[in-house]
């Protein structure tokens, strides 16, 4: 049993609704800057550490926000603390968020033991889903509530080089150990996870649980696009005849879908049904009505010349090889191929996999939003129509999310991606579709998506605009600990939200093996005695063919 007199370090002098002010005991009363508890040396009241307030009723857990010197009524210098309340210890449940019994003036302030903190995490976390250790208590493992993290959306935010890729790899590795039947889809824009690691020549995730596919191999065909997405792809809404083109497009697509699938006896087919239709026939139909004349070529119909811009836009897309995965499918060119696409996408094709890594590194930057929009929509639609969706939860990990789920960019692809992921953010948890957003520019992300996240893992961020934006997202109790954002070390994070029992600062477990995200070794490469021979001809050929 820990001696209460040994852990007492001060008393409460001021109580507000959101924070308390405490005065530390003086050196004459036994103050020491460091105290040993459970064979562990504890620094007294360092910023970001945890303390307890003791009086009759449940103990209150608080976190230190700041400390300073002041003068008491006798003119003597005293040490003061500002602490934020996090929750209460109860005999029934161990620990619960929120404070119902506020302390009175004079209540004792005590140090926390590592064993007591360990109990909080062991009761809150899920099995062996450990992701790191407390920065202030390195012996205390941090376990997450997996259902809250995966099912209620989470965000991993931090500037380049802060360790986001490490954390993603570590999280998934830990999840696969404790939850081997996971269904995780990882969008990998920089090929950091999908190929063998160039440093250890070892796959980042177990090979028997992982399927790696490129966006081109996956082949997400145009006929899966919704009617709204087809409009954004083909119609210039600022054009004079845009309304006519939109209305005519609806009728043509619906007729083509019904005619192409008549033998399948689907019954009712809508303009949004994911069934095959011929893009060539669509083009021919618009061209026919655009060129139709009357009176032996002397007169024009109401539609003559009204589809010029749509035809030009469609021809432009068809001639752009970057859109071949979408507009010129070689495998997904029949309605029944959707079954195989879905199985491959979700890791259900033989052999099955727990993680599907979609390598997006070969996808051009301006086409990326269109690709990711379809991936997000496929995941949502599958479980939306799955009557047992609660038994098949899916997680979408969106690395570099700001490049395709952007707040303000208004290209057709960005609008489509924003709409797709905002729908998941708002209603995905009802159908077992979760998001993990990973970004170095939180202020550039869709506000709707980020605000729907229930857990935030904030790594080093020095940009003042991004720091302020993060503060606007998290609860007030975490604001003090967020002051450390710019001083976090690589691989260190501040965690808040429902996946953790309280705001905390932790050191993320190093992934083993790590992703292929290490910085380029300029000094090493430039000082080599036998440098690598650059194959300029091969590189230029790849560039010209748009193949990586």
Predicted region positions:
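Conserved AAA+ ATPase small/helical "lid" subdomain
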Residues: 241-265, 483-514
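Conserved P-loop NTPase motor module
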Residues: 491-548
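Conserved ATP-driven motor cores of ASCE-family P-loop NTPases powering translocation/secretion/packaging/pilus
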Residues: 422-427, 431-507
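Hydrophobic residues in beta-strands of the RecA-like P-loop NTPase core, especially within AAA+ ATPase
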Residues: 187, 398, 438-439
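Conserved AAA+ ATPase "SRH/arginine-finger" region at the nucleotide-binding site
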Residues: 212-224, 456-465
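Basic- and hydrophobic-enriched, low-structure N-terminal and domain-boundary segments
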Residues: 1-157, 171, 389-392, 445
């Amino acid at each position: 049993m820990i001696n209460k007199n040994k852990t007492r370090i001060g008393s409460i002098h001021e109580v507000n609704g959101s924070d308390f002010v405490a005065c530390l005991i003086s050196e004459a009363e036994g103050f020491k800057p460091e105290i040993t508890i459970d064979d562990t040396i504890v620094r007294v009241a360092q910023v970001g550490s945890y303390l307890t307030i003791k009086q009759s009723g449940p103990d209150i857990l608080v976190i230190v926000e700041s400390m300073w010197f002041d003068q008491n009524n006798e003119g003597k210098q005293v040490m003061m603390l500002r602490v934020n309340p996090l929750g209460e210890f109860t005999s029934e449940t161990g620990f619960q968020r929120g404070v119902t019994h506020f302390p009175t003036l004079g209540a004792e302030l005590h140090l926390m033991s590592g064993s007591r903190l360990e109990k909080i995490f062991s009761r809150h976390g899920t099995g062996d889903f450990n992701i790191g250790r407390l920065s202030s208590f390195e012996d205390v493992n941090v376990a997450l509530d997996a259902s809250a993290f995966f099912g209620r959306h989470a965000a991993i935010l931090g500037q380049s080089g802060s360790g986001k890729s490490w954390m993603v790899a570590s999280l998934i590795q830990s999840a696969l150990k404790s939850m081997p039947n996971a269904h995780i889809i990882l969008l990998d824009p920089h090929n950091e996870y999908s190929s063998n690691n160039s440093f250890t020549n070892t796959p980042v995730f177990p090979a028997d649980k992982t399927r790696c596919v490129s966006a081109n191999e996956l082949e997400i065909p145009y006929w899966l696009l919704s009617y709204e997405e087809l409009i954004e792809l083909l119609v210039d809404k600022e054009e004079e005849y845009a309304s006519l083109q939109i209305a005519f497009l609806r009728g043509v697509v619906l007729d083509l879908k019904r005619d192409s699938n008549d033998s399948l006896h689907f019954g009712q087919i809508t303009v949004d049904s994911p069934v095959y239709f011929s893009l060539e026939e669509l083009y021919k139909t618009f061209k026919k009505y655009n060129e139709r004349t009357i009176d032996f070529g002397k007169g024009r119909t109401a539609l003559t010349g009204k589809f010029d811009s749509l035809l030009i836009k469609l021809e432009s897309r068809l001639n752009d090889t970057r859109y071949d995965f979408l507009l010129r499918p070689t495998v997904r060119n029949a309605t029944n191929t959707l079954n195989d696409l879905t199985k491959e996408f979700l890791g259900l094709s033989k052999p099955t996999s727990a993680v599907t890594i979609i390598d997006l590194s070969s996808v051009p930057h301006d086409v990326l939003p269109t690709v990711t929009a379809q991936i997000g929509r496929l995941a949502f639609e599958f479980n939306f129509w799955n009557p047992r969706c609660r038994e098949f939860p899916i997680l979408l990990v969106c690395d570099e999310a700001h490049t395709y789920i952007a707040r303000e960019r208004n290209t057709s692809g960005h609008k489509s991606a924003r709409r797709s992921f905002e729908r998941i953010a708002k209603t995905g948890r009802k159908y077992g579709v979760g998001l993990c957003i990973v970004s170095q520019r939180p202020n550039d992300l869709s506000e709707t998506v980020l605000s729907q996240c229930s857990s935030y893992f904030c790594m080093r961020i020095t940009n003042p605009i991004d720091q302020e934006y993060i503060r606007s997202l998290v609860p007030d109790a975490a604001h003090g600990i967020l002051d450390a954002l710019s001083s976090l070390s690589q691989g260190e994070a501040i965690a808040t939200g429902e996946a953790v029992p309280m705001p905390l600062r932790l050191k993320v477990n190093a992934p083993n093996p790590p992703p292929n995200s290490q910085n380029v070794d300029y000094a090493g490469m430039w000082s080599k005695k036998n440098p690598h021979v650059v194959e300029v001809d091969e590189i230029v050929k790849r560039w010209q063919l748009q193949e990586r």
